[in-house]
A protein has these predicted regions:
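Active-site recognition of the HExxH zinc-binding catalytic motif
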Residues: 93-105
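Bacterial N-terminal signal peptides that target proteins for export
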Residues: 1-8
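C-terminal motif of bacterial Sec signal peptides marking the signal peptidase cleavage site
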Residues: 16-18
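Metalloprotease/metallohydrolase-associated module, dominated by Zn2+-dependent proteases
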Residues: 20-90, 106-143
């Protein structure tokens, strides 16, 4: 196979990678006042500090949205972008989980601080365990 034949495939891959994350039906969102309180709690448990005002928030219609790991309730992107599924936009654990990604400025879920001391995973969360929206009864979405 010659290099010119590979060029269209390589360009398509590069273009797809350059497009970044796109959850679909999202809208910019003004964070509710309680988010500042949650941000402060997340700073306190993690020992990290950040600028709440730099975060750009988006809400995605529905109970979850497509992401690299399957279906997500929330997702953080570099550049201080947080996407939240509409059904989870007022769920403290989901929102704070994404806030913690922003404070860390990275993806991934190291046990410290996600598992301890912040307890911001499905397995470790000790706060409100409200019933899942009906669309999620087949399993929890990723964050």
């Amino acid at each position: 196979m010659s290099c010119p034949r590979l060029l269209p495939t390589a360009l398509a891959i590069a273009l797809f990678a350059a497009c970044g994350f796109d959850p679909g039906d999202e809208s910019p969102m003004t964070p509710p006042a309680v988010y500042r309180e949650w941000w402060e709690r997340t700073e306190a448990c993690s020992g990290l500090a950040g600028d709440f005002a730099r975060v750009r928030w988006s809400v995605v219609a529905g109970p979850s949205f497509p992401c690299a790991s399957g279906r997500c309730a929330g997702h953080w992107e570099p550049g201080h972008r947080i996407y939240l599924a509409e059904s989870w936009a007022m769920n403290e654990m989901v929102v704070r989980h994404e806030m913690l990604h922003d404070l860390l400025n990275r993806s991934g879920h190291p046990d410290v601080p996600f598992g301890t001391p912040c307890t911001l995973t499905w397995a470790t969360w000790q706060g409100d365990r409200a019933p899942l929206p009906a669309a999620l009864t087949h399993g929890m979405p990723d964050m």
